[in-house]
């Protein structure tokens, strides 16, 4: 990228000078720049342009255009190939080029020109050289330094050499306080103007018809950084304004608002602050200094160049800034309190002050150990610096003294004030010492002031127009030496006219016979009583005029002496006024004294020697009153000067008439008035009658009275029409163009322009010279306080000038508003401007009932100029938006004064919006609230970017005493240290906005809350960065999960504290939980392992301590507490995350529920595994079961804490399932514990059985028998009760209530089952009973045992009394376990299956054998069903016949065959089938038949038929057939192969049945069957019972060889 510099110098045209008004356009690379227009055939522009060139194969196209009324015409064009342009750092004399008429095109690009014209243009084109300085130039600057050092020693400085130095034309010259912050690459813009445009491209005028400012305010594709002539400037994008007092000097300094044509000045008269500042011919002193630093002969690296032509400060590696070690550099100049040479500046138009201090790159400053090159100087460089500084200071002071003497010969580039000079070389602090960054609460954001409002709007041409200033100076003295406010009032007396007399004011007849009007006794003027207040001419002056005309010389002389005395008194009493006027206009004392004499004489001469020619053009009127019945009027105008009266033509039926009529008057009396009256012409009968009676027959529409003395030059003025009397109905305004040629003042500006000159110069003097840049803030109070602009003296000056020369108060206000616009950033100024604009708005917008002129029309009639004021407001609005976009910098929270200015600035914005809406009547101007909101957001965006990029340094400075060095100051995937710091800084920003700025910016409570906007913007930006960072972290996860959790908490706190309640985010599910979800799940995974490890440790500690109770009230041990303490702590972390996303929270709860399940089941498994070993101890098993119960209790609590019914269904189901599992484990532990008492309870029940067996007697119901039964029951229960008493008392003390009930239930079960098993129903498998019978039958040797058993069986069979005792004992045991409500519930005990089984068995004891057999047959319906592994099958046919008479039943059974018999034997296999009829009432009938045996046949055929006779007592459903296949054996019991059962109820319905019956290994029966079998087994004397027990107890015999 190359930098092309083009200087458009001048041109020579062939032709008449009058026909040329030319400007030049430059085009290169789609970028276009334009000069100002200059008249004449030899125009001189002398303007510089700079372009960034990326393609050298193109050319520069130069076009010269002549401005026309409708369109512009081309004079000629020049095309210069870029390859032909020289490279140089210095301007040359330029080259004359001939303009040609046509361009040559190739591939849509210009490649040349043709057809030469006689016109020529002088251009200087060059490419800037690279930053490295040639050795020749380095030697040149070294020589310069030696000269300066020599000058310092000789204490003199050559004025000739000084005069050769050109001023630095830079807008930065106004700035008196710059601050540089080393912000690195983040805030470095290529150009201050374009930077601001890029940042906020819509901060520009919303009014399309306003003239564009000289500086560009719009961006284009590929636009040059300099769309308009750009001065050489310091890299001010690296600067920051300092204090608010100083920063205001960076604002608008001057105006170009009065007349646009004054902007296009020649190089020698260019506005000091104009945008088209000319680049000086050669390098400025700043450039010299910078280049001096850059040169070095020993070849050290030139890391950075700080040239006056560079846009920024670029380091060697391409990054902007001061280097890595420097963080901040502030260079502050002296204030301008002692600018004594300012008057010199007023006279030297081309003089532009450079900044009084330099910001130098660190690398440019040689350290104390470094020295100059040997051939240059042998002394240390620091000494040279000291010489330099002393020399410059002395020269500057000398120049100030010369300037005070008024010698204009020397340039005034050196700034005023002590030590304000170029002390950048040696007086700079040591840059290696790091200065702290500003606090977050006072963040200074880099911004470049847009030049538009500083130059284009604020160029005060009146400060430079010496001719105008000289004239205004005289007029001001004239107005102040004999002010209107001090004029002698008329001495009116009631007067009677003897002849017809007319009013001097209204020219109406003084009606009446006597006392018709008023007459002044001094000057003799006569008028109506109502008109006396309208006469404001000075009585003394009028008397002098009248006397001189009538020859009363003595009287005239007396009056003149009186006026002289009045002026002397005025001069003596108010010397400060005239001193201020002299200082403002920088007039020497001698000239001032002479001028005072001249002015006094002109006042004394009065109007006697005064003469003027007045030309009045009545242009038009607006908003007139409707006087006719048609709702309109027929207006015409009369104009009267002195006694001469003229009228316009009549415009019929128009309330906005246009006349355009010109009248000429001669006036010889400066006290005369121009009376302009508007009339409605009437031609009806009423009008004709009035014409006979009155001089005024037409309707009065309004008037304006203009003092002739207020006229000057050429004026185009709107005047509001005034009433003549209170009864007048008047509205509207009239436009007059007045040209006045006063004798001796033929070529002067209008008084409005003169007033502007006075006001601006006064403002400049009081503010910039006397106030050192500060603006005086009036302290006036009251309705007219806004009309006070200066202190008492200056205010009197402008008021008297305005009063004498007819300047409207609204014009004064708008002029002062324009002046203040250049200082709008000074303390207190926004409030004054806001009040001023509010009153300007009120003046134009608040129409009265007497006028129907719209606000827009009234404003258009403003003498200030509609376009001018609109442009001023547009550019002010633009600058206010830019400043509000950096409100944290411009209005620090730590300054209450600046905060008040911030509030006033917003009020000013609101007033501008009101102006646009009500006065300009724009349809939809930008709402002030939205503008401020956008500005706040823009500032917050910049603030966030700054704190993000400087987070570590800011945090270290604000919150830590010592900075900790970081490997990576920004975000890192290796740690998370950056983010908490950033959150802290964000909070400080939000708090500052909330506490400091929200109360200030409170004008829009419904639309703008700065604290909330701050939180919203900060959160939005933070969320983007945080989300991206965590996505990167998720890939590697180099940090601990706890670190992520801690960050999650901080983010959550930030959101809940500041973001959650924001209106814009309400109702939305926050995103931040999703960023952390994977990290939280990772933490939960790790936490599960920690919890399991902790569980094992807790159990080990508990076991080591012997599972001691945690306290006397707590019945569980420490391990439960420890486990749930750890789980609760983990859950508390999850709960405190307060996850607002229900889906993510559900994921957390599911995962944590799994952790709870694993931990608790692990606990239960360990406890269950070791529990049997602890059952031998008394208390320990109870405590362990209590632990399990406490797990369940705590789990329920945790379930509720996790949400209860609101918990995620999957997590809730998981916890419910876990609760069931724990309940099952507790049941198992209770069962194990209950079973551990089995042996002891067995012993107790056996003792009970022995005692019960000794009970004798019958079971009758006599009282004695009942008492005996109760007593026996007590005796029987004593062994059991002794055991239970001791244990249950212990259990009640040690066990939790729930655990106690479970233990009681298990003991109850064990006791009931044991009593049933031991006392009531001994098991068949015991060595007693049936098994012994079967065994004895098989082995003859056991026959004696069988006999002994049978004897014992008689004793085991319970008698009715024993049953009664046992039944009563059961009731007692039941009451014992109920324990008066403290134990098991009665309903549970009653419905207990164990008790019911026992009682059922007891009830069966009293039933007969037939009844028991019948019950067995009916209840046991599945004895042979469900044979999974049949051992064969038998085919049988059954026929059932019932006798119709007797009801007896006959059953015929035919055994057909057997099939697939599974049997192994070593000997002979001889199977046969045994068929037995089972049922009641069979004792006297044949119950069993057998077939013949078949040898060695596994599928034998029998075909044998048997007949069973059944009684009629029972139906067939009470009987069943039992088929048994056996292997016949001689001399021993037959072996059982298989069994089958066929109930006759299945046959009864059909009457017959034929089927294959599968053979099972044994008979299946339920508890009822077993109980009946046990009871019948004890009836050893009953053959049927014995046979039934044997039959049902048979099972398949053991096979041989198996």
Curated annotation (Swiss-Prot):
Zn finger limits (Phorbol-ester/DAG-type): 489-539
Domain MHD2: 1275-1417
Biased composition (Basic and acidic residues): 196-205, 292-306, 324-351
Biased composition (Polar residues): 206-223, 266-282
Chain intervals for the UniProt region annotation (Disordered): 189-223, 263-282, 292-355
Entry comment, domain topic: The C2 domains are not involved in calcium-dependent phospholipid binding.
Protein name: Protein unc-13 homolog B
Organism: Mus musculus
Gene responsible for this protein: Unc13b
């Amino acid at each position: 990228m190359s930098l092309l510099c083009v200087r458009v110098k001048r041109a020579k045209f062939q032709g008449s000078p009058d026909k040329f008004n030319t400007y030049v356009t430059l085009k290169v690379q789609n970028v276009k720049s334009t000069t100002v227009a200059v008249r004449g055939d030899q125009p001189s522009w002398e303007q510089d342009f700079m372009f960034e060139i990326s393609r050298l194969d193109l050319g520069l196209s130069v076009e010269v255009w002549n401005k026309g009324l409708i369109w512009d015409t081309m004079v000629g064009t020049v095309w210069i190939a870029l390859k032909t342009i020289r490279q140089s750092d210095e301007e040359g004399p330029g080259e004359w080029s001939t303009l040609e008429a046509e361009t040559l095109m190739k591939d849509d690009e210009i490649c040349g020109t043709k057809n030469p014209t006689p016109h020529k243009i002088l251009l200087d084109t060059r490419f800037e050289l690279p930053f490295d300085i040639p050795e020749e130039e380095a030697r040149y600057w070294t020589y310069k330094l030696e000269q300066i050092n020599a000058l310092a020693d000789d204490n003199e400085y050559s004025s000739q050499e000084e005069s050769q130095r050109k001023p630095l034309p830079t807008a930065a010259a106004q700035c008196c306080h710059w601050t540089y912050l080393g912000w690195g690459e983040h805030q470095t813009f290529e150009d201050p103007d374009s930077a601001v445009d890029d940042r906020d491209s819509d901060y520009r005028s919303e009014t399309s018809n306003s003239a564009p400012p000289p500086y560009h305010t719009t961006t284009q594709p590929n636009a040059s950084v300099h769309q308009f002539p750009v001065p050489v400037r310091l890299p001010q994008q690296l600067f920051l304004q300092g204090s608010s007092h100083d920063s205001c000097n960076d604002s608008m300094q001057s105006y170009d608002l009065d007349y646009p044509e004054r902007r296009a000045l020649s190089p020698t008269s260019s506005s000091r602050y104009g945008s088209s500042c000319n680049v000086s011919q050669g390098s400025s002193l700043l450039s010299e200094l910078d280049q001096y630093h850059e040169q070095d002969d020993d070849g050290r690296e030139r890391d950075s160049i700080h040239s006056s032509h560079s846009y920024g400060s670029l380091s060697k590696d391409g990054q902007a800034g001061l280097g890595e070690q420097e963080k901040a550099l502030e260079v502050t100049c002296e204030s301008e309190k002692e600018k004594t040479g300012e008057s010199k500046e007023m006279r030297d138009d081309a003089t532009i002050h450079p900044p009084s201090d330099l910001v130098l790159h660190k690398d440019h400053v040689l350290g104390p150990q470094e020295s100059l090159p040997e051939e240059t100087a042998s002394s240390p460089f620091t000494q040279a610096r000291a010489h330099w500084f002393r020399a410059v200071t002395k020269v500057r002071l000398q120049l100030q003294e010369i300037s005070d003497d008024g010698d204009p010969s020397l340039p005034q580039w050196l700034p005023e004030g002590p030590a304000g000079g170029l002390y950048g070389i040696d007086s700079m602090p040591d840059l290696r010492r790091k200065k702290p960054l500003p606090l977050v609460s006072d963040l200074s954001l880099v911004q470049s002031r847009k030049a538009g409002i500083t130059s284009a709007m604020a160029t005060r041409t009146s400060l430079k127009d010496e001719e105008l200033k000289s004239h205004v100076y005289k007029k001001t003295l004239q107005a102040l030496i004999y002010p209107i406010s001090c004029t002698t009032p008329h001495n009116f007396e009631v007067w009677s006219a003897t002849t017809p007399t007319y009013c001097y004011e209204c020219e109406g007849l003084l009606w009446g016979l006597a006392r018709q009007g008023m007459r002044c006794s001094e000057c003799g003027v006569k008028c109506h009583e109502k008109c006396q207040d309208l006469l404001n001419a000075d009585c003394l002056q009028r008397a002098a005029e009248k006397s001189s005309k009538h020859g009363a010389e003595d009287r005239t002389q007396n009056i003149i002496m009186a006026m002289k005395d009045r002026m002397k008194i005025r001069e003596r009493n108010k010397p400060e006024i005239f001193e201020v006027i002299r200082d403002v206009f920088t007039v020497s004392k001698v000239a001032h004294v002479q001028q005072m004499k001249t002015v006094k004489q002109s006042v004394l001469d009065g109007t006697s020697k005064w003469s003027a020619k007045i030309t009045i053009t009545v242009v038009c009127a607006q908003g007139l009153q409707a006087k006719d019945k048609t709702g309109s009027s027929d207006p015409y105008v009369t104009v009267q000067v002195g006694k001469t009266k003229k009228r316009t033509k009549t415009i019929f039926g128009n309330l906005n008439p246009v006349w355009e009529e010109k009248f000429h008057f001669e006036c010889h009396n400066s006290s005369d008035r121009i009376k302009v009256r508007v009339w409605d012409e009437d031609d009806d009968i009423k009008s004709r009658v009035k014409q006979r009676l009155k001089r005024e027959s037409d309707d009065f529409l309004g008037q304006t009275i203009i003092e002739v003395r207020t006229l000057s030059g050429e004026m185009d003025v709107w005047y509001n029409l005034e009433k003549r009397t209170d009864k007048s109905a008047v509205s509207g305004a009239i436009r007059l163009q007045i040209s006045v040629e006063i004798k001796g003042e033929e070529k002067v500006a209008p008084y409005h322009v003169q007033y502007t000159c006075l006001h601006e110069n006064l403002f400049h003097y009081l503010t910039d010279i006397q106030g050192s840049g500060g603006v005086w803030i009036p302290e006036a109070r009251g309705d007219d306080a806004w009309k006070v602009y200066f202190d008492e003296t200056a205010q009197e000056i402008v008021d008297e000038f305005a009063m004498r020369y007819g300047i409207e108060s609204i014009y004064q206000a708008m002029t002062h508003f324009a002046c203040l616009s250049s200082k709008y950033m000074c303390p207190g100024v926004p409030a004054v401007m806001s009040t001023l604009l509010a009153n300007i708005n009120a003046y134009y917008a608040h129409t009265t009932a007497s006028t129907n002129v719209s606000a827009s029309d009234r404003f258009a009639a403003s003498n200030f100029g509609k376009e001018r004021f609109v442009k001023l407001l547009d550019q002010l609005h633009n600058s206010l938006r830019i400043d509000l976009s950096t409100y944290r910098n411009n209005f620090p929270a730590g300054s209450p004064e600046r905060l008040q200015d911030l509030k006033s600035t917003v009020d000013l914005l609101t007033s501008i919006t009101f102006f646009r809406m009500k006065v300009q009547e724009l349809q939809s101007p930008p709402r002030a609230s939205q503008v401020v909101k956008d500005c706040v957001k823009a500032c917050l965006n910049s603030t966030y970017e700054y704190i993000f990029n400087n987070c570590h340094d800011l945090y270290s400075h604000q919150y830590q005493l010592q900075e900790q060095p970081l490997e990576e100051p920004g975000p890192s995937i290796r740690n998370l240290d950056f983010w908490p710091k950033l959150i802290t800084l964000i909070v400080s920003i939000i708090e500052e906005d909330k506490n400091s700025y929200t109360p200030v910016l409170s004008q829009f409570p419904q639309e703008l809350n700065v604290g909330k906007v701050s939180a919203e913007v900060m959160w939005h930006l933070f969320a983007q960065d945080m989300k991206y960072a965590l996505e990167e972290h998720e890939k590697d996860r180099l940090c601990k999960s706890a670190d992520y959790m801690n960050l999650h908490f901080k983010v959550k706190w930030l959101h809940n504290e500041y973001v959650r309640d924001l209106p814009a985010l309400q109702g939305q599910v926050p995103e931040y939980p999703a960023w952390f979800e994977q990290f939280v799940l990772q933490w939960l995974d790790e936490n599960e392992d920690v919890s399991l490890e902790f569980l094992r440790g807790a159990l080990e500690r508990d076991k080591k301590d012997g599972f001691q109770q945690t306290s006397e009230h707590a019945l569980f041990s420490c391990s439960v507490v420890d486990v749930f303490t750890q789980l609760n702590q983990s859950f508390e972390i999850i709960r405190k995350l307060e996850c607002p996303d229900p889906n993510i929270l559900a994921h957390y709860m599911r995962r944590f529920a799994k952790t709870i399940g694993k931990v608790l089941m692990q606990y239960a498994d360990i406890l269950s595994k070791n529990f049997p070993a602890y059952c031998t101890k008394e208390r320990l098993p109870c405590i362990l079961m209590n632990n399990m119960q406490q797990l369940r209790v705590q789990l329920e609590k945790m379930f509720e804490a996790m949400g209860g019914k609101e918990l995620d269904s999957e997590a809730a189901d998981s916890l419910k399932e876990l609760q069931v599992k724990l309940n099952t484990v507790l049941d198992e532990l209770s069962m194990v514990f209950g079973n551990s008492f089995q042996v002891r309870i067995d012993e107790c029940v056996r003792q009970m059985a022995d005692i019960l067996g000794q009970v004798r007697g019958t079971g009758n119901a006599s009282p004695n028998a009942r008492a005996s039964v109760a007593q026996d029951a007590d005796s029987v229960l004593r062994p059991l009760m002794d055991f239970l008493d001791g244990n249950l008392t212990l259990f009640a003390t040690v066990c939790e209530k729930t655990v106690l009930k479970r233990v009681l239930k298990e003991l109850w079960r064990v006791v009931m089952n044991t009593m049933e098993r031991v006392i009531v129903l001994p098991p068949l498998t015991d060595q007693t009973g049936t098994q012994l019978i079967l065994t004895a039958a098989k082995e003859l040797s056991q026959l004696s045992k069988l006999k002994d058993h049978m004897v014992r069986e008689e004793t085991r069979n319970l008698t009715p009394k024993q049953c009664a005792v046992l039944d009563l004992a059961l009731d007692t045991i039941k009451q014992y376990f109920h324990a008066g409500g403290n134990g098991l519930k009665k309903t549970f005990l009653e419905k207990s299956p164990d008790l019911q089984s026992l009682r059922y068995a007891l009830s069966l004891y009293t039933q007969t054998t037939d009844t028991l057999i019948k019950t067995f047959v009916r209840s046991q319906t599945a004895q042979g069903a469900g044979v999974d592994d049949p051992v064969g099958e038998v085919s049988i046919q059954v026929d059932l016949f019932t006798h119709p008479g007797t009801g007896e039943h006959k059953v015929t059974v035919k055994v057909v065959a057997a099939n697939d018999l599974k049997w192994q034997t070593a000997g002979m296999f001889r199977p046969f089938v045994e068929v037995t009829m089972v049922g009641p009432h069979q004792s006297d009938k044949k119950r069993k038949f057998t077939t013949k045996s078949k040898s060695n046949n596994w599928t034998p055929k029998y075909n044998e038929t048997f007949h069973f006779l059944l009684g009629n007592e029972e139906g067939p459903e009470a009987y069943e057939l039992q088929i048994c296949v056996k292997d016949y054996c001689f001399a021993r019991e037959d072996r059982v192969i298989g069994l089958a059962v066929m109930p006759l109820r299945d046959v009864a319905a059909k009457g017959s049945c034929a089927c294959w019956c599968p053979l099972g290994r044994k008979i299946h029966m339920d508890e009822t069957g077993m109980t009946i079998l046990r009871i019948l087994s004890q009836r050893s004397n009953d053959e049927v019972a014995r046979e039934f027990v044997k039959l049902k107890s048979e099972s398949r015999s053991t096979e041989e060889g198996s």
